[in-house]
């Protein structure tokens, strides 16, 4: 249900998504629950790339999946906060309050996601063309032939070579980098306002990773979409992000422009993440490779609470 004009006016016109004090809990053993996301707030402007960065277990992927309302299928519950999104028609809604049926209709059309491993997302028994076309026919009133043409055009958009032939191929016939391009094509098929990329380059070698990052930047300029980029790699953050939110143990500990985060990191954990990135020339004049001079940061224990 669209929000009232008063509520909509709280969202600046250039903002696509605003997450406010988001709280997510997972049921644990006995009567305990684990607060995986604790008071997270951030916003994403139109055409902007926001990087949500942190180590494994920091809550960054849970935050992204919660925006898509997918964590509820894994036993999680949203215990507080709002997820306000501006749709392509200008209406604003709180995704937390929408029905599952309504949210399902928004996935792919208004907001889409690209996962880390394309082989776990692509169906091995359907062709690439069929899988992209399915997303189109699900959200748009298109004939099978029209959907196939849109699938072809989208493959060309993401720079898949020989796109006509790839339409009739299966996922196992493509390389890892090509499969990830197909996943991005599926996410873009209905031209969503926001694309969530959940560590899309982690399983790829550095050369293909660079190609995917270049592709995302180029697509943003061509389409004008916003991006929420989930990663643990500060090197990737430096390449892709406009703004950065550093996440630790379910909380955002530092936020700033990508320049400010790298030029003057304020939190010890941010400095530790940056120090983990190898620096070209750091081993110059050394007789043998040395260990990276990591900054040690001891986080607080995970919050486990008794269920109410």
Region locations from a protein language model:
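Short, glycine/charged-rich "phosphate-handling" switch motifs in NTP-dependent
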Residues: 243, 255
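Charged, flexible cofactor/metal-binding loops and thiol motifs
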Residues: 13-15, 91-92, 257-308
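Conserved ABC ATPase "signature" region
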Residues: 84-86, 146-165, 274-275
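Helical segment within the ABC ATPase nucleotide-binding domain
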Residues: 210-224, 235
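A short, proline-enriched helix->beta-strand linker immediately N-terminal to the Walker B motif
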Residues: 189-193
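A short, surface-exposed alpha-helical micro-motif characterized by mixed small hydrophobic
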Residues: 237-239
């Amino acid at each position: 249900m669209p929000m009232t004009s008063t509520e909509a006016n709280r969202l600046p016109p250039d903002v696509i998504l605003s997450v406010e004090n988001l709280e997510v809990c997972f049921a644990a053993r006995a009567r305990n629950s684990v607060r995986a996301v604790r008071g997270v707030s951030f916003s994403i402007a139109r055409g902007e790339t926001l990087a949500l960065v942190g180590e494994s277990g920091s809550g960054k992927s849970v935050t992204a999946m919660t925006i898509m309302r997918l964590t509820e299928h894994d036993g999680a519950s949203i215990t507080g906060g709002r997820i306000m999104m501006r749709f392509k028609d200008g209406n604003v809604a709180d995704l937390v309050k929408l029905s599952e049926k309504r949210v399902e209709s928004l996935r792919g059309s208004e907001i889409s996601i690209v996962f880390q491993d394309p082989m776990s997302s692509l169906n091995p028994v359907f062709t690439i063309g069929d899988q992209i076309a399915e997303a189109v026919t699900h959200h748009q009133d298109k004939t099978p032939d029209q959907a196939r043409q849109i699938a072809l055009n989208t493959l060309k958009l993401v720079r898949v070579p020989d796109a006509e032939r790839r339409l009739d191929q299966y996922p196992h016939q493509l390389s890892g980098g090509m499969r990830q391009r197909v996943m991005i094509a599926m996410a873009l098929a209905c031209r969503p306002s926001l694309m969530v990329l959940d560590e899309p380059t982690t399983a790829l070698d550095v050369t293909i990773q660079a190609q995917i990052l270049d592709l995302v930047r180029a697509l943003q300029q061509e389409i004008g979409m916003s991006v929420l980029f989930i990663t643990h790699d500060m090197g990737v953050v430096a390449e892709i992000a406009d703004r950065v939110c550093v996440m630790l143990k379910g909380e955002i500990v530092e936020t700033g422009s990508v320049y400010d985060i790298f030029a003057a990191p304020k939190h010890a954990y941010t400095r530790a993440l940056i120090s983990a990135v190898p620096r070209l020339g750091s081993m110059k004049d050394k007789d043998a490779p040395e260990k990276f001079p990591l900054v040690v940061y001891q986080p607080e224990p995970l919050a486990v609470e008794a269920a109410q």
